[in-house]
């Protein structure tokens, strides 16, 4: 992995940076997918599986958030990372989905109790 404290000036470093940003997008997407899979399990009454999937979702989201924080710190407002906006969108929608799905799972648990 490249040094996220220094934003690249060369094409090779830019390609490495894009790879890191893609990792942010992938982790965010994985977090969202796991959260929706957890909701499906909760709707079927399998709350243990739902909890396990939400734990996995949280870990993927934490990884994505860590990368995002380092990228933002490294860019220092210079706008060198065009794809970062797309990556941030993935992260924020994943965070929102996870929060809402947590609430929905709790509602399903109460309804099935």
Q: What are the residue ranges of the model-derived segments?
A:
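Terminal alpha-helical segments
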Residues: 2-113
